[in-house]
Structure formats: C-alpha cells, structure tokens
Amino acid sequence: MMDSKVHSHRLLFIAFLLIVFDQATKIAVKGFSLLGFTHPGMFLGESISVIGEFLRFTFVENPGMAFGVEFGSGKIFLTLFSLIASIGLVYYLLKIESAKIQIRIAIMLILAGAFGNFIDRMFYGVLYGEGPLFYGLVVD
C-alpha cells in the first residue's frame, strides 16, 4: 500500500513538471522581456513546422473552455472552477491509490491541464496587458 502512495506523490511531481513545461512553452510563445533580454515570441495565428506538415505549433488563444466554448457566467467562474477542479483532482488522485495506473495517469494529465489553465486565466491578462487578474486568455 505504501508503494501506491509513493506513486501518487510521483504522479503529482510529474504533474508539477508538466505544468512548469506548459508555462515555459506558453511564455516562449507569448514572448517576454527579462533583465535586458527580449524574446518577441510568435504572432497570434503564426504556425511553426516541427516535423513537416505532420506536427506544427500554432499560436492560438482560447477565450473560453474546451474548444473555445464560451460560458455565460464569465471568466471569474472559469478561473475558480479550474482551481476547485485542480484541488479536487489532487485529493482524488491521493485517495484512489489502489486504482489502475492508467486511470491515475489520466487524472494526473487532466490535473496538469486544469491547473495550467488556471494559471493562464489568473495571470496572463495582467502580465500581457490583456485584462485584469482572473481574466487572462488560455494560451493553447
């Protein structure tokens, strides 16, 4: 049983690493200026070929939920929902230690995505001058 608990903590650590990687790539796409170094980033809609036409990175911003679906209650609800969902997923991941690893990995990936979107909505509006706290666009 202890081994499963270690796995849950390992999965949370992997989720943390995925969130860091997700945010680093988003900052690289959006651009930044730090300590005299400026990286211009990509233009909205710009696409970069990674492996020919098979794999391309395209800069898009999502104002809503999955697939751009808008929600009537506004950004503050989506931001809080992302936070609450992330907390719930952490709790659930720690509680289902006996579940199959595939289920736990799927939950870990959903957690990383939900928390990454929370960070986007929370801070990107302020950092990039697009809106107040809680009103940033999700960079996809």
Where are the regions that the model predicts?
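Alpha-helical transmembrane bundles and membrane-interface segments of multipass inner-membrane proteins
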Residues: 1-140
